[in-house]
Amino acid sequence: MTPHINAPEGAFADVVLMPGDPLRAKYIAETFLQDVVEVTNVRNMLGFTGTYKGRKISIMGHGMGIPSCSIYAKELITEYGVKKIIRVGSCGTVRMDVKVRDVIIGLGACTDSKVNRIRFKDNDFAAIADFDMAQAAVQAAKAKGKVVRVGNLFSADLFYTPDVEMFDVMEKYGILGVEMEAAGIYGVAAEYGAKALTICTVSDHIRTHEQTTAEERQLTFNDMIEIALDSVLIGDAL
């Protein structure tokens, strides 16, 4: 047990899928896993363990923002022996060639947060995904006939940012999606010797203002979830 996770030792699989919303974690577990058991519920940050096509996998929410997700990722790795974390979440986009409901595999994550500079002695840390996990996700998408975008994310500290000019900079540098956690999770994984990947579904277009509802974000991002789950099986074979 930790101050934030009340699961017993051995309750989590070595691979954990982490959406931000704990209700989305519940939906994923109940929809895609078999033999599901709720293993933690502190602060209503729900976590579940079950099997997917016979493979033990856990699902747990991580909340919003780098501080929240970093706490859960660190404790899962150091206290429960988790080896791989796949963040499955929503993101916005500023690019006109990226559409709402597109799936993005985050090879790297830029950020305006200082957390990785703090852990990396005030130097820039390249927050990147594990290559094998990213490759497995691309293979899983291709096997399902799904088109995915692969590239950089931007993990923002402010959801309601006053710096709208930064969106132009993001677009210039080819940022595919804007979210709030990937850079933190990649930093935690690097610090504690684990592996991580972020897969996002575009829920909002910052330029056109097209967006999905909260219910759609919870229930209809199934392509992303299936890609993540199948990537675990592919990764086991690599």
Swiss-Prot record:
Keywords: Glycosyltransferase, Transferase. One of its GO terms (biological process) is purine nucleoside catabolic process. Disulfide bonds: none annotated. It comes from Haemophilus influenzae (strain ATCC 51907 / DSM 11121 / KW20 / Rd). It comes from the Bacteria. Catalyzes the reversible phosphorolytic breakdown of the N-glycosidic bond in the beta-(deoxy)ribonucleoside molecules, with the formation of the corresponding free purine bases and pentose-1-phosphate. Belongs to the PNP/UDP phosphorylase family. The gene is deoD. GO terms for molecular function: purine-nucleoside phosphorylase activity. Phosphate binds at residues 20, 24, 43, 87-90. The active site is at residue 204. Pfam families: PNP_UDP_1. Transmembrane segments: none annotated. This is Purine nucleoside phosphorylase DeoD-type. A purine D-ribonucleoside binds at residues 4, 179-181, 203-204.
